């Protein structure tokens, strides 16, 4: 029997969803008998849950969970505290590489650090949690921009104020478009002293359950610490770390999907 509730209709709807999640697709009769819901009430709830896309009918006329639940779970996962999810993974990456690590996000066309992980052995870089980032001069900024929807990306690029901070800074939209295309192809970005001449950075994207960009991580060092040979090694480590965080958010790689 259902427990008493001040909102019995809501309780019964949740019980229906939990029942189908537990035993799989089932008929209206099974739902009514198992939960002890009056027939008229059950059909009202089932029809409303279908209308709201929480439920659907399969080819055998059994009720099954449907797309609205997937959408809601994706939103919930994407809003989980990224900092606490990422902190142990970034700490491990810092321990492995001996370099400073960041987690950054893009919001309303601007990028920010939301987590900085360092030790006494890492270099001192002018960064802090909450610091805004250049979207065209930093590795993590370019990474965040590379995976924006095309229209959003173009709008952001059109609004950029270009400043040549170092000899390697990108200073033209066409250069940036080419760089972003290269980043998407290789799966990671690189700051070749484009914001600070002596600083190098490798960054990789973090995705959610809907395969949408959620954040990016970066590994930062001096030009002596991150040479071309070590850069490629760091890229592999950064990608692996970013994928670990992505999986915690419900993301699945093509290999995960093939195995499931």
UniProtKB/Swiss-Prot annotation:
<dbReference type="InterPro" id="IPR014757">
    <property type="entry name" value="Tscrpt_reg_IclR_C"/>
</dbReference>
<feature type="domain" description="IclR-ED">
    <location>
        <begin position="82"/>
        <end position="251"/>
    </location>
</feature>
<keyword id="KW-0805">Transcription regulation</keyword>
<dbReference type="Pfam" id="PF01614">
    <property type="entry name" value="IclR_C"/>
</dbReference>
<dbReference type="InterPro" id="IPR029016">
    <property type="entry name" value="GAF-like_dom_sf"/>
</dbReference>
<dbReference type="InterPro" id="IPR005471">
    <property type="entry name" value="Tscrpt_reg_IclR_N"/>
</dbReference>
<dbReference type="InterPro" id="IPR050707">
    <property type="entry name" value="HTH_MetabolicPath_Reg"/>
</dbReference>
<keyword id="KW-0238">DNA-binding</keyword>
<feature type="DNA-binding region" description="H-T-H motif">
    <location>
        <begin position="28"/>
        <end position="47"/>
    </location>
</feature>
<dbReference type="InterPro" id="IPR036390">
    <property type="entry name" value="WH_DNA-bd_sf"/>
</dbReference>
<dbReference type="GO" id="GO:0003700">
    <property type="term" value="F:DNA-binding transcription factor activity"/>
</dbReference>
<feature type="domain" description="HTH iclR-type">
    <location>
        <begin position="7"/>
        <end position="67"/>
    </location>
</feature>
<keyword id="KW-0804">Transcription</keyword>
<dbReference type="InterPro" id="IPR036388">
    <property type="entry name" value="WH-like_DNA-bd_sf"/>
</dbReference>
<dbReference type="GO" id="GO:0045892">
    <property type="term" value="P:negative regulation of DNA-templated transcription"/>
</dbReference>
<protein>
    <recommendedName>
        <fullName>Uncharacterized HTH-type transcriptional regulator RhmR</fullName>
    </recommendedName>
</protein>
<dbReference type="GO" id="GO:0003677">
    <property type="term" value="F:DNA binding"/>
</dbReference>
<dbReference type="Pfam" id="PF09339">
    <property type="entry name" value="HTH_IclR"/>
</dbReference>
């Amino acid at each position: 029997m259902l427990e008493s509730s001040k909102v019995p209709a809501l309780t019964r709807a949740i019980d229906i969803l939990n029942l189908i999640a537990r035993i799989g697709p089932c008929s209206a009769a099974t739902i009514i008998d198992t939960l002890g819901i009056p027939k008229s009430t059950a059909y009202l709830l089932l029809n409303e849950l279908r209308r709201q896309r929480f439920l659907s009918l399969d080819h055998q006329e059994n009720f099954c969970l449907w797309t609205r639940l997937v959408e809601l779970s994706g939103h919930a996962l994407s809003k989980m505290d990224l900092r606490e999810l990422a902190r142990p993974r970034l700490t491990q990456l810092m321990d492995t590489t001996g370099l400073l690590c960041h987690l950054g996000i893009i919001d309303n066309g601007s990028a920010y650090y939301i987590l900085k992980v360092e030790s006494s052995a890492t270099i001192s870089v002018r960064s802090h949690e909450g610091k805004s980032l250049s979207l065209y001069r930093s590795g993590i900024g370019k990474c965040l921009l590379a995976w924006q929807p095309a229209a959003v990306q173009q709008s952001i690029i059109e609004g950029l104020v270009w400043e040549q901070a170092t000899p390697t800074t990108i200073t033209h939209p066409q250069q940036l478009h080419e760089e972003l295309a290269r980043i998407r192809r290789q799966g990671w970005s690189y700051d070749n002293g484009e914001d600070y001449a002596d600083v190098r950075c490798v960054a990789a994207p973090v995705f959610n359950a809907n395969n949408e960009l959620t954040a990016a991580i970066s590994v930062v060092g001096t030009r002596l610490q991150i040479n071309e040979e070590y850069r490629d090694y760091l890229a592999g480590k950064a990608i692996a770390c970013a994928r670990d965080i992505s999986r915690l958010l419900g993301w699945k790689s093509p290999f995960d999907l093939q195995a499931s």
